Amino acid sequence: MRSFVLTLLLCFAASSLWAQAEIVKHPIQISDWLAVGPFSSGSRERGIDFLLEHGGEAKIQPCVGMQHHSFLAPGGVVRWHKTTAIDGKIPLAYKNVNWEALQEAWGWMGLANVGYAYAEYQHLGTRQVALILADKAGCFYWNGCPFPGDVYGRHYVYVPVMLKPGNNRILVRVGGWKEPKFSFKIFPVSVAIFINTFDLTAPDLVRRQPLDSWLGVPVAVTSERPLQNITITLDDKSGYLQPIRLSIKNLLPLTVQKLAIPIRTNRSWPEADFAADTLWANLKVEADGQKYTARIPLRVVNFQQPHRVTYLSDIDSSVQYFAVLPPKNFAYDQEKRYALILSAHGASVEAIGQAMAYEPKDWAFIVAATNRRPYGFDWQDWGRLDVLQVLQLAKSIYPIDSDRVYLTGHSMGGHGTWHIGLHHADQFAAIAPSAGWDSFQFYVPLFLQKGEIFGQPQMLAIRDAVLQEERASVFVENAQNLPVYILQGSEDDEVPPTHARHLFGLLKRLGYEVVYNEVPGKGHWWNVDSLPGGTSCVDHPALMEFLRKHKLNSAPRRVVFKTTDLSVNNRLYWVQIDRLQKLYQEAVVTAEINNEHEIEISLQNVAQVQFLPEALTRLIQPGKLRLIVNKQVLTTRWQRENRIVLSLHNDRYRLGTLKQGKLTKTPALYGPLRQAYFTPFVFVYGTKEDANQHLHAARILAEEWWWRGNGFVTILADTQVTSEIIQKYNLILFGGPRSNFLTQRLQDYLPIKISNEGVTLGSFPIPGSDLAVKFIYPNPLNPNKFVVVNAGTSPLASCLSERLSLFYTGVGFPDFMIFDLSFKEKGWGSMIAAGFFDQNWQVAKEYCVVR
């Protein structure tokens, strides 16, 4: 492969505004590349390396004609070939692939694939930092080190890399449908900080309204050394903003952190006659004696317009926003309460755009959460938690009637409506999914994953136990007291009407209140001009009228509650499940008030359940109470404000609680692995050995959390973790006991032990020189928080574990996983052991599979 010699001589003054604005205006773009593909890629499967035949993604140096096996291509072989950029876009230009046949055989998943492009860049200067923007690329390797791409092509994922003198190898991994294209831009920089104004999370300034909120600004450290004693100031020339001064002790080299900056208006703002639609704020960052400035545009609107409201996330203290459309002709009235319509957007849609699709109602606030990003997390996991926080914020900010809260959404947001509505049915008076899909397997099937091809059924059952909570079909029984309106276009080829028809049928057969409106001739996103309101597929008059006529029944006489994962939700109306008999299997509570002194209860896979007094006081009377539990009769005397607790002892239920050990799984301390990232967490990299490897792994995962989840995470060395950090955060550890001081400190107190010779899982020895390990466990130094260990029996295995991200939905990681380097080829087929800790956080045969 010949080197492409490109030279750029740019010199920027570090203290000038022009420098920050101009850094990303004059990129180096490579015209000539080598490309190869396509390789079959299973939906939502990470970590597969399709280039292992020639060294793998990190090491390959291809040439024209070098071949790899791929069953998507004629003859089962693909070869590296030349390709040239066209208008800045690099086509992978696959050869002779019969896409029609693949789609006919496998549906649209037959078009999903991964390809690669390779080039070399000759840097004539000394070591220098550059920013890279790899649009529509999943990731790229710079001299063998992986970095995140801007997979969705949103044009904001600028990541710092180090240019070395001479030849620099570039490998870009691109996923997509049929024949994808990408762009790759290099921006050499000579400043230490890049303020990324392409990815601001900013509130709107509302005329006549004071502002006391937050601004999120990504800052990239484009320096090889850490920056100390950073000062950030925010103000504006007009004086409408209060001057803000913020101090940060240090920023790590070559990192991107989206910082939370307070933003407040002065007293003069509510009285200001500000006619312009933008107020420009000035942001200044001072570090090591240098000043870096950027102008921040703040949109100015009237209160009646859809506008953005920012807040700090409970998960990671990052700045998020929701959009709000106030009621028509709204005026504050202490006596008046409005309905709240929570609206979930579809993939690629901004929350502010979702709010703009509606016409104002005189009876309701419309609030659109973000799912953390336009693509985000399918309204599951962090997306679900985002909605629940926005719900509480909206109820605290606006005059909301809690009995008239509704959930609706379109496409991905329709799935979110099903997912959130069925898991949290007691939060909503009614839900209205539009073009919503049921589950991943029903929508984007996983059958082409390498794990599906190579995985043992017992191992895949562990993964599927984690994933089952995303299947709406499984939880439709929870809609016993939740009216549902389903809207669907009959000709929708994005989310086919089969999803809506299927879920409608399930609800109808249960006898639940459900309306199905399949609109003839309409596709995915549609409008009917003759109908009043906003865009019809989200603001349909019949849908809105259905919502409007319903009020929440917060104390229903009959409750059906099904769950499989208490970390997602353990409470519905007046029923709370505290413990399951068998973890991650379906648990069902059916409880019905027969009369004022009798409750009939059916329990399936429930070890302990509570019935909560707030609702019961409206349903039963104090005094003697008869409980019929799985046909077993119990009696008690009940007083108002008393909880009723039932627990299982020797196959029979009795009043009272189960004994708890020193460590017991509770909904807040339950697993699986992803739960450690649902409450505040920090990354802790090892410095005993391989410090650069661990730090880089922490960097790229922090960058993924930023670009995928609009998130923030602090990265610390193992020697920097204080008792205060241990008390406040879940610790995500990079490196095993050989390379991380903190992992070494905890090793004797953890049920999984790692050495150079192998892994011990409880009492099971698993020998192996290249075993990767990931597991979650209550922190022995603070059992109210988690530790997550990412490690291995070798540097290669540790690297594999550390880089295996779970910042996406459909990941299916349980409490612990032990796997080998064949993960890069076989995915879940590489698992040596996987499973869940038992109720007492111990290794138990019934909850794990060891190969």
Q: Which residues make up each language-model segment?
A:
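Aromatic-lined ligand-binding clefts that engage carbohydrates, nucleic acids, or primary amines
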Residues: Q122-Y141, I170
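C-terminal catalytic histidine-bearing segment of alpha/beta-hydrolase fold enzymes
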Residues: E491-D493, P497, R501-H597
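A domain-start/cap signature at the N-terminus of enzymes
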Residues: A202-P203, G239-R337, G671
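Accessory carbohydrate-binding/adhesion or oligomerization-edge regions at the termini
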Residues: S15-S16, Q20-A101, R169-D204, D212, ...
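Mobile cap/lid helix-loop segments that gate and shape the active-site cleft of serine hydrolases
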Residues: A429-V476, N481-L482
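Active-site machinery of serine-nucleophile hydrolases
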Residues: R337-I397
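Gly/Ser-rich "nucleophile elbow"/oxyanion-hole loop immediately N-terminal to the catalytic nucleophile
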Residues: N329-K336, Q380-M412, L422-F428
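Solvent-exposed alpha-helical segments and adjacent loops
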Residues: E600, F611-E614, L619-R851
